[in-house]
């Protein structure tokens, strides 16, 4: 049924494609889930059309969209930081 609430753990999986929108921005940035911890999602660092990395401000709100087996999962998250090894990634809060 449309609008049903689902737990993030049932939808989000390592390797899954996700799309992000930053606060006050309608540009879509594509990414992929690299790892999932108890409280964080580690996602590949998105790049813009010129292949420049997108790095939000710490604490910036993000809107995410992932397509699951039978649903489109929308969620809000917060940018916590970035890392570069072994690949450039964002560290964001894990939605509930």
Stretch-by-stretch model annotation:
Residues 1-96:
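Structured alpha-helical
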């Amino acid at each position: 049924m449309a609008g049903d609430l689902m737990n993030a753990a049932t939808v989000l999986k390592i390797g899954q494609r996700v799309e992000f929108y930053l606060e006050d921005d309608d540009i879509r940035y594509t990414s992929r889930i690299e790892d999932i911890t108890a409280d964080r999602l580690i996602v590949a660092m998105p790049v813009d059309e010129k292949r420049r990395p997108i790095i939000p401000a710490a604490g910036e709100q993000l809107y995410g969209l992932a397509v699951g087996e039978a649903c489109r999962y929308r969620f809000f998250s917060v940018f916590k930081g970035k890392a570069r090894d072994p690949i450039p990634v964002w560290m964001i809060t894990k939605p509930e």
